[in-house]
């Protein structure tokens, strides 16, 4: 029997410091319909900066 497709979608978290650095993660579209914003470490500028959700192409 085929496995049901889940609610989780792969997303890319892009640094707001415009360094080009990004993280990839998954989020549940049903529980979090809004765009994700989270503060994470950017190793290029060596600081914690805001990362914003973007689609994986």
From Swiss-Prot:
GO terms, biological process: translation
Keyword Membrane: no
Keyword list, A-Z: Ribonucleoprotein, Ribosomal protein
Keyword Repeat carried by entry: no
Gene3D superfamilies xrefs: Ribosomal protein L33
HAMAP family membership: Ribosomal_bL33 (MF_00294)
Protein name, as recorded: Large ribosomal subunit protein bL33
Species name: Shewanella halifaxensis (strain HAW-EB4)
Gene responsible for this protein: rpmG
């Amino acid at each position: 029997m085929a496995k049901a497709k889940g609610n989780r979608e792969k997303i890319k978290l892009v640094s707001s410091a415009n360094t080009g650095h990004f993280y990839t993660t998954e989020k549940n579209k049903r529980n979090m319909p809004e765009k994700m914003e989270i503060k994470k470490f950017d190793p290029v500028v060596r600081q914690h900066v805001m990362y914003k959700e973007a689609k994986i192409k």
